[in-house]
Amino acid sequence: MNSFIKMMNVQNALEIGTSNGYSGIWLAKALKQTGGKLTTIEFYEKRQSIAKENFKICGVDDVVRPIQGSACEVLASFDENEKFDFVFIDACKREYVKYFEMIKPHLTPKALIVADNIISHAAKVQDFIDAVDADDEFQYEILEVPGGILVAYRG
């Protein structure tokens, strides 16, 4: 993902599912090189607190906007002008399809979506895969790395 961000010169990235901040740190390190920012959403307050500390320790807290709350509620609260050119999804698997539908109005014309655990949680994310497949705006591939990831490109 670090390479995607640098190659695409990403300016505004969104992470749905912060957890302890591990993925967000890698995203933020790449965004520091592009001059971009990361917005990251986590439901659990304790995880968000740990992530904030990890962002600070790793020196990326200046490019990270952590938001604690339900991803669907947070996404619904975004201003219509808030746009993202990269989205990483690694949260409640059954909600992936909802996240996809909710983020589409906030994507730039050439946005990239990366969704984790596509193979390991196939039954829970099948409706998401079907939605991406049915959407003519997106081309996608499923990469058979551990857990599996779906990479969808709008354009």
Where do the language-model regions lie?
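S-adenosylmethionine/decaboxylated-SAM
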Residues: 2-155
